[in-house]
């Protein structure tokens, strides 16, 4: 009996890790059956379903092309980046030309009503923290949301301008902003 238990133990440990109990910072962020590594292959509906299953607070990027498109045409690309705080509420950032809009949506895949960023003074978000830190806002801003940690840990997002030379680090847990020289 003990021999059987020891034979099954590695498989059991592997199962626990695959369910998000692995605390390794370099592990792929898992939400149900969808890993962030395979995110580009899943649809919005699939990801939404998996996020509901996971019930974890995670950052993710909702558009699949980033570096190449920014390098090709940084001024005319509309970027939509979502910060999912839980399964029922998210904040959506829309970057279009010189304008930045924020919407608060119950479902990230539904279109929200754009609100001018400058008219919002109470929203506790990374971009508001960015303004409070007196860091100059580039005319076109893009967010890179990294996924290289477990659901219990949120990797910081990096916001930078269209020239891709000026980085700002946004702590995913606290919202604190600091510039990377």
Model-found features: residue ranges?
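Sec-dependent bacterial lipoprotein signal peptides
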Residues: 1-17
């Amino acid at each position: 009996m003990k021999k059987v238990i020891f034979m099954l133990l590695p498989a059991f440990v592997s199962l626990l890790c695959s369910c998000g109990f692995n605390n390794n910072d370099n592990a792929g962020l898992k939400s149900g059956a969808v890993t962030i590594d395979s995110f580009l292959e899943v649809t919005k509906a699939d990801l939404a379903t998996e996020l509901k299953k996971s019930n974890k607070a995670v950052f993710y990027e909702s558009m699949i092309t980033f570096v190449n498109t920014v390098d090709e045409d940084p001024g005319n690309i509309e970027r939509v980046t979502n910060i999912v705080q839980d399964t029922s509420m998210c904040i959506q950032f829309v970057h279009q030309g010189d304008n930045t809009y924020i919407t608060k949506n119950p479902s990230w895949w539904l279109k929200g009503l754009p609100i001018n960023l400058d008219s919002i003074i109470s929203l506790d978000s990374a971009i508001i923290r960015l303004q409070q830190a007196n860091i100059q806002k580039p005319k076109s801003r893009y967010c890179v949301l990294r996924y290289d940690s477990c659901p219990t840990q949120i990797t910081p997002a990096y916001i930078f301008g269209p020239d891709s030379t000026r980085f700002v680090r946004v702590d995913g847990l606290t919202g604190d902003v600091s510039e990377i020289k």
